[in-house]
Amino acid sequence: MSLSHHVSLSLSRAPGVFSLLLINFAVHIATTSFAPGLAATLALSHLVPRWWQFVTAAFVHASWEHLFGNAFSLLVFGRMVEEEEGAFGLWATYVVCGIAGNVASYLSAPHTATVSLGASSSVFGLFAVGVLTKVRLDVRRMLEAVVLGGYVWKQVMQETAALASGGTTVGGMSVGHWAHLGGAVGGVLLVLMLSRLPKGEGE
């Protein structure tokens, strides 16, 4: 199988994940190489927030390391969500959880010089949705839910402990623990809301 065929096959199987990855990488290249001022427009300013920044901040990253860390989690958990909910469900989860995380981050430090950015809140939402969509009466899916649930629980506990200790700093930047937890809560609420919608006859 040629490399081009393999890439085309991957894109056809998970178009939502790869479109999100492409946008995140394109935005980072644009903000670091061609339009540095664009980052300030897209990232969430806590001092003077703009409504669109609660969405666009989920597509902006501070560094390549920051981007690759989130891209890896998006690739793994995003594909899980897309397998269960489709490309639209993945995009909805990414955006809704990104907004939830950014709102939580803003409320934790309103009207300050803080700037929130990164896909971490969306990724934590994908963590939660990815696990909850596996919780079904099926041995294989339940095993997946247990393994993934243990990982997600560990991440949430680490975020909670970090908040309790006053937060952490990486590379001179404060980690958005409130955004992470907000994204996870957004994911849980999204699944609960969707589970209450009436099912189609064939579902």
Model-found features: residue ranges?
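A detector for small-residue-rich transmembrane helices and their helix-helix packing motifs
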Residues: 1-203
